[in-house]
């Protein structure tokens, strides 16, 4: 199905001579050697591969199948939280992506969000997002990994309110369509036993970075849209993707469906690299809401 939003991205790709592909955040400079940031990312992925080779559970106590491939075209700092993993971007002050393995049991719990407050993440460098950046912005503090997926544990719930897991999000989208999608993902986790989820911001509607909208004194980037990809590994594996514009105008879920391949082209992120190649190729090329 052709969608206006996807065509817009494709058009930008075609007319931008300076871009080879649609990227969420271009690199600041060509990388020379291995930076401390790169070494940290490589160490994280090496640790997970070593754990898998020893048939051990990874140190994060979550399955690592949901993790995208390392990013080379933008800043990336991997943050391992109890209930999810963050790829943080020090330039945009928001995550590149947030990934988690949502099980049926994790959709239940006693932890309540009204007991929590939004907090700067001390693991990321300054300047970083703080509450003051949002006060007069008219944007909600939008969760990437939702509080509703972290009711199972006090630490997981608390960490979901770190600003490294938050993006400036239109109020209408946050309270309506995005919330509906979060609820739908929990329903799928209960139905299938578990799902692997990755979501994050989409940038790229501005060829000139000076046109990028920001909020607050720390210049937190405002996304043009948000993506979410969901993988079910049970039985005959399947995957589905979504992109919602960061706006208040109503967006029907069925009209926001994308294949994972399409979202990879738009975001420049390689999803589910640990899947068997044959399975990955198949599930990423097809997306039908009716299959879910």
Residue ranges, per PLM feature:
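Bacterial N-terminal signal peptides
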Residues: 8-14
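Domain-level detector for secreted/extracellular nuclease and nuclease-toxin modules, and
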Residues: 5-6, 17-292
